[in-house]
Amino acid sequence: VILSTSFGQSFGKNKVQYRDFDWSYIQTPNFDIYFYGDNQDLAEFTSRVSEEAYKQISTHLAWDLKNRVSILVYNSHNEFQQTNVVGVYMSEGIGGVTELFKNRVVFPFDGDFEQFRHVIHHELVHAVLNDMVYGGTAQNMVASRTRVRIPLWTNEGLAEFLSSNWDTKADMILRDIAVHERIPSVNELNYFMAYKGGQSLWRFIAGKYGREKVGEVFRSMKKTQSAEKGYQLALGMKWDELSDQWHKYLKKEYWPDIANRDPLEDMSEQLTDHKKNRNFYNVSPSLSPDGSTVALLSDRSGYFDVCLLYTSDAA
């Protein structure tokens, strides 16, 4: 997650600080890693991953950091929620943040080293972009009169692409929207689709035009002071044409997968109908051992309940 500045608390959410943190830090050639307690081993792991990630990011963007980046590592998500680096309340779904005011990266360790590695890499993409486009701090951004706003799908999509390249979750999501012809335009890549849709878009750009175009897009944004004009200068097309090219790419990739498949409605029976019941969620299904019953979470009553549905094979 990238935050442009330290916003006020989210409405109705109190940021309660239960303890004081006695911070220590270690340094690498490009980063200051802050930690507390007995977690120096975690800080050293963070330092190694950060420098490895930075080499990859720097190569793709053709940019060397001009300013050191501070990284603050919390021991748990509960303690991460107490951070005063940003004023925004850190909900459970936020795995890390990078703020522009001083270009600081903040994240918790949740016990999963592979996910932790991904979060470090993801957030450092934001930090390097901040340094490249905005000068690394809000003060430098004002001094240089940089007005360009990097779209969320551009920023988060690139962070996902450089930290994961391509993954099964992204493949599943893009396959689904391509098969069902619900591919959004680039301007419609909001919320969760800013991450996975943006990741797919950067995969398309890097695959068709070469990875050197990644950094060129951002240099062009800074030069033109416009996100769309930056894409146009670097790729030779406006966003409408970029959307069309990306849509064709996805259809070419995924449509052959369904050419020889039977339609789902011809080979199965639908047990839930959210349109008929006027609800939003029918999720987390679990089949009974004999296959006669399905338990799932549903909000058909207006609240989340565990519902039991009997399959067509039930006695």
Segments predicted by a language model, with ranges:
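A short helix->beta-strand "capping" segment at the edge of beta-propeller domains
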Residues: 259-279
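Juxtacatalytic substrate-recognition/specificity segment
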Residues: 8-151, 168-169, 187, 226-230
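Conserved small/polar residues in nucleotide/adenosyl-binding loops
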Residues: 310-315
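Residue-level detector of Asp-centered blade-edge/turn motifs that repeat once per structural unit
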Residues: 289-290
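A flexible loop/linker signature enriched in serine peptidases of the S9 family
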Residues: 277-280, 297-306
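Active-site-proximal alpha-helical
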Residues: 33, 57, 150-170, 175-237
